[in-house]
Amino acid sequence: MKSTQRVTELVLCLALLGSLLIACVAAPAAPADTGAAAEPAASEGPRMGGVVTGFVSSDPKSFDPAAIAGWDQGVIAPNLLEGLFRLSPDGREIEPAIAESFEVSEDGKTWTFNLRAGAKFHNGREITADDFKYSFERVLNPETRSPKAWMLSIVVGAQAFQDGSANEVSGIRVVDAGTLEIELAEPLAPFKAMLASINLAVVPQEEVEKWGEDFGQNVVAAGPFSLGEWNLNQDVTLNSFDDYWNGRPYLDAVSFRFIGDENTRIVELDAGRLDMAWVPPAHWERFSTDPVYKEKLGWAETFHTDFIAVNLDREPFGTNAKLRQAVRYALDLDAIIASLQGRANVAQGLLPPGLLGYDEDAVLNYPTNLESAQALMAEAGFADGVPGTFDVILPPWGNLIKLLEIYQANLKEIGINIEIKPTEFGPYMEALESGNYDLAWMYRVTDYADPDGFYFPLMHSDNLGAGGNYARYANADVDENIATARATIDDAERARLYQEVDAQFAEDLPYIPLTHNIYVDVSTPRVQNYVPSPMDTHMFHRVWVEE
């Protein structure tokens, strides 16, 4: 049999993280204290003014919070967008933003937010509770086609609003201009973390209606920077927002150039035309020994997992768990880590270290073992190999293709032939959402710093297909454990439930886990107080430059 994967075009969001996966994997050994490397002593404290130039892999196309789904957008957008909460610069803490304070009812279902007086949009208008109601209902509105509508699906009245039987979401209530109330159908442990997502940022209705389909290219929001000049496929500039509720940023502006090639970024860094870049493996030795740059290396173990998604609706891989287990045993992940110079860790499941529920003593146990792989091939009914060739679709990132060639050679040893199919991001995502694929390389960076950001979209049957469960995995016990964990406030009990999910995952393997990235970047000596984030975001509101 063959697997002739047809992929059509798609959006331009995820392909960018491929660059991240390869350019940002980690070096032989991180310094004892991860996060940003120690800064050289500055002659003075933070100073106002200046411009920092960063990069993303390609033009983000849109900063509409309801539509954001890709890496390039996610790097830049947190500087433009803000909602009730925000992430700290290192991505590990949730900070109050436009919600100055909040209360949760005893039953955990009703959340009341007291908005910060005087917080403004970039157009100068003060933000009110009505703006949040509008923004959240816009995400839920089927006409918006937001890929993150599931984040608010637990709000009372969300389903009625989405199916057209109600003209508003009854569980989102404006108490007064400065007070917002949200009622959930049941308690949701990660709700606060979800509200820090850029997808749930507040936007002004009048600007959305003014710009229509072009709002994403002319976004008006409430973050520390506002959208400035945007040169298609070249660069975008964000300008400091003087009326930001927390005081204007130190910088006058941040510019992001669109540079896909990792070596070009290094050339531009050396020429003084970039202030930061990922450190490719080939350049690690140079930067780690340079007396200036070695003090400007930043590290972060990311909340990022790469894996091979299996379409469970298609034979033979989707209908045969033993065949999927054989695939995992056959993959030489240590060779992958070596090729990345140690800038990644072997993934023992979907969940990366550092998130609630990760248990290194209870993780997936599929070490590279050809004998085990061949035994499982025989049990699966394919002792002589699987007839035919099967496509693996993936974004068209050069270094990623090189990694897939290692997997291709591994699988050939046990009689599985795959063809590597680089696919533009639009068609790639279209294939995942429609189920028009057999195997696909994928990654996930959690939308919020909670295990629910992995398990609910990828494994709950409510999210089959476009909702994020691209494997089309459905297991009633897993659904129940995920749902119970979402509604449980006790962290120990949540961790136990997720470990039960992991145990079932290890048996079923709807996704074949590969690696977790370790992010390594370098900045020029003038950049101060920059911290890389495990969430793959670049936050600049506390960055300053020393000239």
Located regions from the model:
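Extracytoplasmic/peripheral linker and loop segments enriched in polar/acidic and small residues
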Residues: 45, 325, 337, 417-428, ...
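Ligand/substrate-recognition segments at binding pockets and active sites
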Residues: 54, 378-447, 491, 516-519
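N-terminal lobe/hinge region of extracytoplasmic solute-binding protein
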Residues: 55-106, 137, 217-221
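Gly/Pro-rich hinge or "lid" segments in bacterial periplasmic/extracellular proteins
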Residues: 88-89, 166-173, 177-178, 184-249, ...
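Periplasmic-binding protein-like
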Residues: 192-194, 288, 313-355, 402-403, ...
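Ligand-site clamp/hinge motif
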Residues: 213, 241-287, 408, 417-419, ...
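Structural transition elements
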Residues: 345-379, 397-402
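Long beta-strand-rich cores associated with HINT superfamily self-processing modules
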Residues: 521-547
